[in-house]
Amino acid sequence: MIQTESRLEVADNTGAKSVLCIKVLGGSKRRYASVGDVIKVSIKEAAPRGRVKKGEIYSAVVVRTAKGIRRADGSLVKFDGNAAVLLNAKLEPIGTRIFGPVTRELRTEKFMKIVSLAPEVL
């Protein structure tokens, strides 16, 4: 469960290490984002020679949450931390590699590229 001012790790090779959620997209009163939701983020920590710079604003999709996601069979998939993958204006991933597992809930038309790049799908 991600809200405004939440800090997330970055799970791709764009050069960003940590980001801050500045807006949850999808309606004016929308408060929380879960796995598969798109948010606006500001880069807070970045590698010196990365593709992105500190202070830049990007869209991102949430790929892991510590709160977890409930499946239809009753199981709950949780992670140790919150993570996101940075997206361009067309909602395509900027990075060419994904680090760590992602959930099956990302298997929609929009984010199949992220699922195919991920080393493990839970």
UniProtKB/Swiss-Prot annotation:
Q: Which molecular function term from Gene Ontology is one that the record holds? A: structural constituent of ribosome
What's in the GO CC field?
cytosolic large ribosomal subunit
One GO BP annotation is: translation
Pfam families, per the entry: Ribosomal_L14 (PF00238)
Alphabetically list the UniProt keywords.
Ribonucleoprotein, Ribosomal protein, RNA-binding, rRNA-binding
Which family does the similarity line name? Belongs to the universal ribosomal protein uL14 family.
Q: Give the matching HAMAP family.
A: Ribosomal_uL14 (MF_01367)
PANTHER family from the UniProt entry: 50S/60S RIBOSOMAL PROTEIN L14/L23 (PTHR11761), LARGE RIBOSOMAL SUBUNIT PROTEIN UL14M (PTHR11761:SF3)
The cross-references to NCBIfam families, in alphabetical order and at most eight, read:
rplN_bact (TIGR01067)
The entry's function note states: Binds to 23S rRNA. Forms part of two intersubunit bridges in the 70S ribosome.
User: Subunit structure of this entry?
Assistant: Part of the 50S ribosomal subunit. Forms a cluster with proteins L3 and L19. In the 70S ribosome, L14 and L19 interact and together make contacts with the 16S rRNA in bridges B5 and B8.
Name of the featured protein: Large ribosomal subunit protein uL14
- Upper taxonomic classification of the species? Bacteria, Pseudomonadati, Pseudomonadota, Betaproteobacteria, Burkholderiales
